[in-house]
């Protein structure tokens, strides 16, 4: 068993375990009941046990010390709940050891998304919109890990882009996971040695570093380049009138530019490019700036002003109209009875 304490690896001897061989045990019970068991008498059957030997030999684990890939992203603009979710997801992955041929599922490692598992409500993408959900921000964890895995050149078997663009990595460099859509980020340790995943957060930055045994040539370097193939800029604002809310209530969601992008893997030897390979292609939805605007008022004229402002499809015009209506109402409230006559 491999652990990392204060920047140094420590190896703990594994212990042999035993697991019940369910199929063989069921057969043994059936054979006893249909064979030697005498009806009405007590009896017992020994379950069939299988030996579960610990993985990893000490001499193999002792070789794990080289940085195969590392990557850092920032969540400096995130609120407290999203920041907690990023740190929590990171801690659930930190300390993972994968032996040659092992498969790692990010979703299975960080689930369930519940308060009991350390998550809180925060913003996330769902069907091209920003919504609050338990575990919002977990995709920054999977994305950061994805980029470390790419630099370690491990085998990626499943990766999905977000429905809309994210800001913490370049287009096509993201890896979304989602319970609702079944998205996962999965990779395989395709090296001949164990690898260790170190993850930590500090100063609102998350870093994953993958350690193993470096077998790649020293004069060889790997880099990744994002290419935007198509860009779709939102045009008119989308404004929804809400008759259940009073004038002055407005909820605005930011616009998202739509992209088609590709990610390229570039290999250089002695500083000279020797190969360029497409890693993935990604499509991100365009989403206009949207607003839900309250129009309810005892003053029909104020409601009419709001409806006219909404018809312009300009959130800025709507905000200006709200300010004008409030100013009119304040001025009217300040009038004396004599002035109203």
Please place each PLM-identified region on the residue numbering.
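Well-ordered beta-sheet/strand-loop patches within structured domains
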Residues: 1-341
């Amino acid at each position: 068993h491999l652990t990392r304490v204060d920047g140094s690896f420590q190896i703990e001897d594994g212990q042999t375990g035993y697991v019940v061989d369910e199929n063989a045990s069921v057969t043994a019970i059936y054979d006893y009941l249909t064979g030697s068991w005498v009806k009405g008498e007590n009896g017992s059957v020994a379950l069939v046990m299988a030996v579960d030997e610990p993985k990893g030999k000490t001499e193999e684990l002792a070789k794990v010390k080289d940085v195969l890939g590392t990557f850092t992203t920032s969540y400096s603009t995130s609120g407290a709940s999203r920041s907690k979710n990023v740190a929590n997801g990171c801690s659930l992955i930190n300390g993972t050891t994968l032996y040659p041929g092992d498969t790692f599922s990010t979703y299975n490692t960080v689930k369930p998304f519940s308060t009991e598992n350390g998550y809180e409500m925060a913003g996330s993408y769902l069907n091209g919109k920003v919504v609050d959900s338990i575990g919002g921000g977990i995709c920054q964890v999977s994305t950061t890990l994805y980029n470390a895995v790419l630099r370690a050149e491990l085998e990626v078997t499943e990766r999905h882009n977000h429905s809309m663009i994210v800001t913490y990595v370049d287009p096509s460099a993201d890896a979304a996971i989602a319970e609702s859509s079944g998205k996962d980020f999965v990779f395989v340790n395709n090296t001949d040695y164990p690898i260790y995943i170190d993850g930590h957060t500090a100063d609102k930055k998350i870093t994953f570093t993958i350690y193993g045994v470096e077998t790649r040539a020293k004069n060889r370097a790997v880099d990744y380049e994002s290419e935007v193939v198509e860009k779709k800029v939102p045009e008119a604002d989308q404004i929804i009138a809400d008759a259940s809310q009073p004038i002055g209530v407005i909820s605005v969601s930011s616009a998202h530019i739509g992209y088609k992008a590709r990610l390229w893997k570039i290999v250089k030897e002695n500083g000279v490019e020797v190969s360029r390979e497409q890693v993935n292609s990604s499509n991100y939805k365009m989403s206009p700036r949207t607003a839900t605007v309250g129009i309810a008022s005892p003053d029909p004229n104020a409601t009419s002003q709001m409806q006219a402002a909404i018809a312009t499809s300009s959130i800025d015009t709507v905000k200006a109209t709200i300010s004008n209506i409030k100013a009119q109402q304040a001025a009217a409230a300040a009038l004396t009875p004599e002035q109203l006559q």
